[in-house]
Amino acid sequence: MDPSRHPRTIILSDLHLGRPGGAEEAARLLPIVDGCERLILNGDTAELHHGRHRPKAEAELGKLRDLCHARAVRLDLIAGNHDPFVSEVRSLRLLDGAIYLTHGDALHPAIAPWSPHAAVMRAAFERALAQGASRAAAPTEDQLFAAAREAAIAEWQSLGDGAHVSTIANMAIRPHRALAAVVYWRSYPALVRDWAERFAPTAGTVVVGHSHRPFVRTLGGLRIVNTGAYGFPGTPLAALVESGEVLVHRVEERGGRYRLAERPIARWSAAPRGPQPPARADASADAMKPAASASAARSIDVA
């Protein structure tokens, strides 16, 4: 596809609609919906996982669909571990494979190593993989996605009516959970790179979510964007694909509504993987001036 004809596309993740501390309500996304022709929600869009939040999550998801439909905005939903049945789609490729998207839950057998249910999820993941994978070959992308879904279901069954303790409280009560999260955050970019090398070797850009820690990294010529989450622990990001470029913006909350910050914190050509110059911070973005050096521009963490 001619990149100049690609619709203005915004990619978000981990809205957790319906859950306190998440984006909560679809109406809060109206400025973002109004600013694109295609909206891709890369997993954990709605808190369908927890029984106590599910009714509101389903209602807000319906409202979001209506918002997009009324504005002729194409809405694509990629399934995550909190909404494994929201869609059959687990990954997307844009611009003839130059950009690859997946939620990120399938990258680790424990799905969320910091979770009190990590052992349950790992056991379900490995059991599903053993049943579906050939002993003579490495598991396929679809087999890993199927195993991740089984792990999410296992956690769902363990939760019952839903989580009654927040992630922050869980980490305060059990400090080893916080350590597990930090270890996972540090390893996550390499997990993404390894996954892309196996399943998206032509992609020059990979967009993920899941870990809730937003960042922009370059590893071995591969651009990696984690769009973060709405709530703990930091400012979410949006990946904007327009006119053959990827632009990464902070998502700001003003007046109870979410919108993209005026200036991107990083941008690059949406090209297939190959030798590329370092991602550059936008020269006019005052908040990101430290990222103007080549080394900083290759690794931007957003607090």
Where are these regions (language model features)?
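Conserved beta-sheet core of the metallophosphoesterase superfamily
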Residues: 62, 66, 91-123, 185-249
